[in-house]
Amino acid sequence: MYQEERLVAILDFLKQHNRITTEQICTLLQVSRDTARRDLVKLEEQNAIIRTRGGAILPTVHQKIQSYSGRLKTVSEEKNKIGRLAASLIHDGDRVILDASTTVQACAKHLNAVDCTVITNSINLADVLSDKEGIEIYLLGGKLEKEHRFLYGSSVIEKLSSYHVDKALIGVVGISEHGITIAHEEDGMVKRKMIQQAKQVIALADHSKLGSTSFYQYAELNEIDLLITDRLPNQAFCDLLDRNGVELLVTEQDEGKD
C-alpha cells in the first residue's frame, strides 16, 4: 500500500473514531511502528491531524457560528425533514419545551397538534407558533441575545424550574462521546435546565453534527432519550448511542415506510 493510500485510511478511521493510536495503525495497515510514525508526521505537516503521545486526533475546527437570521436562510431540506418527523411525535394535549435552534423552529412550523402548551426561550419560534390555533405559548423572559435570537439568564433558568413537561426538543451543535455540546455557554445553561424539566428529551441534529464536539457541554449522552437525524450514522456511532440508551430515528428510514 502506498503512503497516500495509508494516509487516506488513517483519516477515514479518525473521522469515525476521532482518535487513533500507533498500535491501531500498525494493525489496521499491517505496517511497522516506524512507518506509522512517518505517516503521522506527514499528516501533521499537512495540518490534517494533531499528534498526541502514542497516536493522533483530528484538529478542532473553530468555525464562526452564523447569526440566527443567517441560519434561517440556509435551513436545509435535511433540517425540514428532521423538524417534520419531530413534530409528528408531539401529540394533542402535550406540554413541551422547544429551544431556540433553527432545527427546532422547523419542527414548530410543522406542528399540527392541538391543546398543546409550548414553553420556549426563542422569540422567533414563539412568533411562528402564534399563527397556529390550539397552542398556548409561554415565552421565557430574560436577557436577549440579539444575534442568535434567544433569551437567557438566571430569570429564564429560575422560571424553567417551575415547569414540568412531557417532552423537551433540543437542537444539537455537537453530539459525541463527550456528550451534548454547543458554542454558547449561556444557551447551554438554559438547555441543561430544559432537559432537567422534561420526562422525555428529544435531540435534533443533522448528520454533520454527529461525532462532533463544540465548546460547552450541557448534557451527558445518557440524558437524551431519542435522537432524530437525517442519515443513518456509522456503526461506531450507533454503538455509542446503544451504550447510552439513546433511541435513534432517521428521516430517510421513516420516508421509506411510506
Curated annotation (Swiss-Prot):
Alphabetized GO MF terms: cis-regulatory region sequence-specific DNA binding; ligand-modulated transcription factor activity
Domain of life, source organism: Bacteria
GO biological process, one term: regulation of DNA-templated transcription
SUPFAM superfamilies attached to this UniProt entry: NagB/RpiA/CoA transferase-like, Winged helix' DNA-binding domain
Keywords assigned: DNA-binding, Repressor, Transcription, Transcription regulation
InterPro entries tied to this protein: Carb_Metab_HTH_regulators, DeoR-like_C, DeoR_HTH, NagB/RpiA_transferase-like, Tscrpt_reg_HTH_DeoR_CS, WH-like_DNA-bd_sf, WH_DNA-bd_sf
SMART domains: DeoRC (SM01134), HTH_DEOR (SM00420)
Domain HTH deoR-type: 3-58
DNA-binding region(s) in UniProt: 20-39
Reported impact of G55V: In grl-15; loss of glucose repression, deficiency in glucose transport and absence of ptsG expression
Residues spanning the membrane: none
Function: Plays a role in carbon catabolite repression (CCR). Specifically required for transcriptional repression of the levanase operon by glucose but not by other sugars.
Descriptive protein name: HTH-type transcriptional repressor GlcR
Classification of source organism: Bacteria, Bacillati, Bacillota, Bacilli, Bacillales
